[in-house]
Amino acid sequence: MVQLPTVHAHNAAIFQSRPIVAVFAGATSGLGEATLRALAAAHGTNGKGLRVYILGRKREAFQRIVSDCSRLCPTGQFIFIQSPDLSLLGNVDKACAEITKAEQENAKGEQARIDLLCMSQGDFNFDGYQGM
């Protein structure tokens, strides 16, 4: 198995090589939140640039998390995209359009892109549908 210091060194090398653009769906709690915080910490103050689009339902949760992430990565951009329910394809289409527009505006002469996509939104109910 790869040793943890080797993983940390590799991650640091990625961030020092070029700016990173990431999209997180489900980063306002749970695994997505922990992964976002780890990304901000790995980038830290030595990375070439970090821009993260965070899809979520609640702006309040986003603001709390971004406050912490901004301390870990003061040069990072953390952008909230309101997304009420990503289990509905219409909402997914709307979120994608908003991300595309925002990234084209924020790329500032660079190629608009997404380097990393982390999707951990929602939950799964093994008991079946409970709405009726």
Annotate each language-model stretch with its function.
Residues 2-132:
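Rossmann-fold NAD(P)H-dependent dehydrogenase/reductase core
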